[in-house]
Every structure is written in C-alpha cells, then in structure tokens.
C-alpha cells in the first residue's frame, strides 16, 4: 500500500498554475517545434496570477486578428452556463458573426455561477481588449476556465490586458505560450497548425491553427474544454457556423474523458480572409466541401490531444461503430461505450472483458429501432501495429479468445475497439450502414486522486 501511495503521489498533477510541472516525457512528442500560422493573427500569453498560487506562469491568453473576422462558436449545453459563455454567445448573435477581432481567455477561475457580477466581469474583459484596439463595438469573445463558483480577480486581469496586447506576436513561441496560458490540469499545451489549398485557388496557400485545453470534465456536447481555431481563408459567417458545427460534432463532441460536461465548454473559430481568394458562402460549393473535410480532420486531431492528456489516463482508445442504420445512432452507441466506468476500468486493468462493452451497447438510449440486433453484432480489438484483429464476439456468438494475445494488445497505449452492428434490420453482417467514431481514455487510480485534491 505504501508503494502504491508513492506511485500515485508521483503521478498527480494537482490543479494549480497552468502547466506548472515539467512536461512528462511521454507527452513531449505532442508539442510542435514549429508551425504554419495564419496571416494577420497575433497572440500572447501573459502572467496575471488569477489563482493566488500562480506566481509566474502565463494565465491570460489573447488571440487577435489585425483585421475584422467572421466568427462562429459552439457552446456547452450545461444549463449552468458560465458568464463568458453567455457574453460570447450574445456578441456573436448581436454582431451576426461579423466584425470580431479577438478572443481573450483566462485560466485559474471559471467565472461560472457568479451571478450578475460575473457577467459584468466577463463584459469588462472583452471591453478592455476592444479599448486597446480602439474599438467601440463589442468585438472580443471571452472564455474562462478553472474552479466554478468563484469571482474573477477582475482588477488584476484588466490591469494586464494592455500588457497582453502590447506583447502580441505571430511567432511560434508566442503561439505556444498562448496555448500554455489556457491550461489548468493539462500536462502539456495543445497546439496544431497546417496549410491547405481550396479548389477555386489551387495555387494559393491557406493556414489553419488551433489551440485547445482540457484534461478532465470532458464529455462535451456542443475540464473544461476550450478551443480557438484561426484561419486566413475567407469564409462568410453563416458558412463558418455550419462548418464548425459539422466538424465539432465529429471531433470535440466525439471525445470523452470522464463523462462530465462543463459549464464553460466553448469552441470558436475566426476567419479573417487575409490570404485572399473568393469567400466561401454556399454549402453547395466545392470550396465548402473541401473546407468541411479539412476542418473536420483538423478538429479531430486537435480534440484527440485532449483525450491523450486525460486526467490519470494510461490509454488512448478509439471506438469505431460500423454498419449503423444512421450516424447518430452509431455515435450514441460509441458515446455510451466511451462513458462506461466498467469499460474504462477494465481497459486500465488490461482486462479483455468484452461483456462490459456489449452491456454498454445494449443499454444505449435513443438509437433508431432495430439498430442493435444481438445476432448481428460483432466486437473486436484492432491492434495499432497492423496485426490481425482479435475477434471477441462474431454475429452474437462469443469467440474462444486468446487471452495471451489480448493481454499483449492491452499493454499498448493505443487501442481500437470495433463494433459491427451488421446494419441492424437493414441487411446482412458487414453490408451498408453508417460509421461513427469516438475517442476516450481509461479510468485510473490517479484520476480519483487528482479530482479529490482539485481545490487544494
């Protein structure tokens, strides 16, 4: 028992300042050493000390465009919506997704369930950024992350906003520092960027960058999950909103760490069009279709970093539900498996207990009639090394499982669970149907320790 206590103590990342410990060696591979960032965007990460114990780490992030942007966002469905969620939602609605210049984010305090005063604090954060830009209309989205039920040290934040504005930069180091500033229990900053082209301008290069944070309280439905994406492609607000909604549904809304949905979850995207070209406005255009694929793939890669940093996680698990009669039914089944504590703890214990997976499939609520037919259902483990799949259940019949091989597969950090519904009532095994993919992690002793100590 003493040895176990020492092991857990060595792993724990207590909630304090953003990324206040050395980044674990196993996570360093996820931190980019360079990037391709969109034209016209500048960023900064500044120390405020929102949380009293934070004496040196950046905890105020500012992302700004040198020109007005189209903007879109998706927000938490939690009924206790934090003040910055309410304020940002109102700004996008009032401005109709036009003329947005910046996003300001603090870590260390969620500004959630803080009443009228909390709303005033969120408004004042955005207004202070607008003043630095010489703007009279609300043009800054606001996000916060941290402990719920506490007021922001707003005077400290407002004092540092001009400093953050003065430090705005387009360098890779600035982007990485900004990604660091939004972290709480995260063990590493989550930042990605890429270039792309569009069919209408094959010779023109565009860039897309994004940062996110989250390690616990992750089961979004749009620890706290926040994300900001920026592109220099020209996209009209209505098209941008539909593009974001589609991509988030297949990325940030398809991950789970612990099944909890935060009061603050927000994913926003800004498009300033600085790279030129014809604006994307119609969902029927080739550019729209290409951008949808690009944004969805990018958002999936970014959201998967959250799962890889799940509190106490030792495994990154992909669950792939095939041959569902419709996408949403497949996603509901994948989500139920991903949320199951029994599945997650079995994976942590390296136990090929496929009965727990089958149980989760069977009690999934809200799926289309005929989606789950026991005699059509198959479950398997797919190794990431490309070796043959390990069948656990085929057409409702259990396989003679090679426990030794199952143990080898479960020793790996990455694992894929494949659930084949056989198309339900629509057809034979393996024919037709939709595919839904979800990403999640296991439950370990460390998760309990981290969250038991969260406010201390």
Curated annotation (Swiss-Prot):
Record keyword Isomerase present: no
Record-listed substrate binding positions: 184, 213, 224, 311, 451, 456
Catalytic activity: N(2)-acetyl-L-ornithine + L-glutamate = N-acetyl-L-glutamate + L-ornithine; L-glutamate + acetyl-CoA = N-acetyl-L-glutamate + CoA + H(+)
Location of the protein in the cell: Mitochondrion matrix
Pfam families per record: ArgJ (PF01960)
Its EC number(s): 2.3.1.35, 2.3.1.1
Residues annotated as the enzyme's active site: 224
Top-tier EC class: transferase
Site positions per UniProt: Cleavage: 223-224
Gene Ontology MF annotations: glutamate N-acetyltransferase activity; L-glutamate N-acetyltransferase activity
Example GO BP: ornithine biosynthetic process
More info: This protein may be expected to contain an N-terminal transit peptide but none has been predicted.
Function: Catalyzes two activities which are involved in the cyclic version of arginine biosynthesis: the synthesis of acetylglutamate from glutamate and acetyl-CoA, and of ornithine by transacetylation between acetylornithine and glutamate.
Record's protein name: Arginine biosynthesis bifunctional protein ArgJ, mitochondrial
Phylogenetic lineage: Eukaryota, Fungi, Dikarya, Ascomycota, Pezizomycotina
